[in-house]
Amino acid sequence: MKHFEANFDGLVGPTHNYAGLSFGNVASLSNAALVSNPKAAAKQGLQKAKALADMGMVQGMLAPQERPDLYTLRRIGFSGSDANVLKQAAKEAPMLLNACCSASSMWTANAATVSPSADTRDGKLHFTPANLVDKLHRSIEPLTTGRILTATFSDPHYFHHHSHLPEHNSFGDEGAANQTRLCNEYGHAGVELFVYGQEATNPNAPKPQKYPARQTLEASMAVARLHQLEEDNCVFIQQNPDVIDQGVFHNDVIAVGNQNVLFYHEQAFLNTQHKIDEIKRKLDTELYFIEVPTAKVAINDAVKSYLFNTQIITLPSGEMAIIAPTDCQENPAVFAYLNELLTLNTPIKQVLYFDVKQSMQNGGGPACLRLRVAMNEMEVAAVNQHTLMNDALFARLNLWVDKHYRDRLTTQDLADPQLIIESRTALDELTQIMKLGSVYQFQR
């Protein structure tokens, strides 16, 4: 049976804007109040997804969240008509309105943690939506995320869906952005690397001082238990608190893995060699640990260019390629390193550059935009086929974006009641295109 690693990219929502909501994310904060282009953002994401599908990759799309989120605004005391709720919130609590209009669900690396059937005791693919409790604008996502995942991976014979973890900082969970999986072949049992920022229940353990550690060890261990993973299938690694304080808010900003390759910065982890030895003990295959030294790429350059927020994919030919943002080409140190990497004796033979600037300016590169799901061909066949990228879906979604999306959006525009109508009309049509059913609150 054939096995694949599918990528499910987040479709950028109609309210994509730059509100600077993500403390600890340097790009998000530094670009606050820029004018955004939701239409361009959605099309950039679709272009990347279609390019991977054209390379022979299994590529899907995940629907965005409903925004503005009027239900949250009503929960916190704003009342009256929908237009009045927006007007009140804009006047009395503009940052809360901004949080309820965020299109951050485009970064599906944070949507959930996924464990493939090759790793789990019950032989099913497991999904746990991330609770994202560290950031208000993301903490309102998990319920709808769960519905979208269930509508996409609906067959209970193959897919096991869990609820998100308790909504408390002790279980702060940011999903697959802090998890990577090493294996020989996608269909073989692998080792899942769970990277955490702090131990919530141990006040003496190392933790960052400037920016929050969004992922806890307690959350990572809870997800591993839910997913029925054996101890031999897991390695728990602490991210270096110093790099979190330099803007590395998720592990996928400083490391990325694929099959038998782990590509990471030398400052990424604590106790790096000890953890590499543990990986080698638990995974009996040839492994490539590609450590990028600070002398070649400084942390600041890694964060600005998102060198590690790249995708490493295995092409149908068996060679690996890096999917990088064009920002990596524009940074001399990073571009020089990537060119050097291609001359080294590793499975990575190509670097392909994509323009995802609308996402990058909000703090998310190519790896943020995708949720990896390793599957066999029977599981792929059980996926909602209307979510899988092909020529027809690409054309239809581009027409849908042209019809419904604005090409200019400011934070002041978020108070426009017309945005509610535009967004709901678009999402209602999208659920019909992708055959998702009533996943949104306004449809229920």
UniProtKB/Swiss-Prot annotation:
GO MF terms here are: N-succinylarginine dihydrolase activity
- Report which superkingdom the organism of origin falls in: Bacteria
Q: In which pathway does it act?
A: Amino-acid degradation; L-arginine degradation via AST pathway; L-glutamate and succinate from L-arginine: step 2/5
Swiss-Prot/TrEMBL GO biological process terms? arginine catabolic process to glutamate; arginine catabolic process to succinate
Q: Tell me which Pfam families the record gives.
A: AstB (PF04996)
Explain the purpose of this protein.
Catalyzes the hydrolysis of N(2)-succinylarginine into N(2)-succinylornithine, ammonia and CO(2).
Listed name of the protein? N-succinylarginine dihydrolase
Q: Which organism is it from?
A: Shewanella baltica (strain OS185)
Q: Which gene encodes it?
A: astB
